[in-house]
Amino acid sequence: MFERLVDVRWRDVDALRHVNHAVFLTYLEEGRDAFYAQVTRGDPMYVVVRLEVNLRAEVRHADRQVRVRIEVERLGTTSLTTRETVLTLSGEVAADARVVTVRWDADYGKPVPFSEDERARLTEAVTG
């Protein structure tokens, strides 16, 4: 399991005085980018091919930060399925998501397999 703290910014809040629903995708992306950077030990080159998000609770600017948790569910040849959660610092689940990403070669514009080193680190993340 991987976790990252993400700041709640003033611009994230909408007229209803809570974090706008679209911003949760940004929080998840920030956590996922940090996770991929650690796993790939470099620039995280991936594309999101499927994203399912459930919004569970409000987050307000006064919360200051949220915790993004990434758990690996399935590792394919080029794809990775993760369970991603946005939690308040008090531990309340604000959003949860299931995300499928594909390792991407930007030069050729197509999926590429994970390297052996990446697979080893991802397998470790699956088995914990």
Model-based region annotation:
Residues 1-67, 73-128:
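Terminal targeting signals and extreme-terminal segments of soluble enzymes
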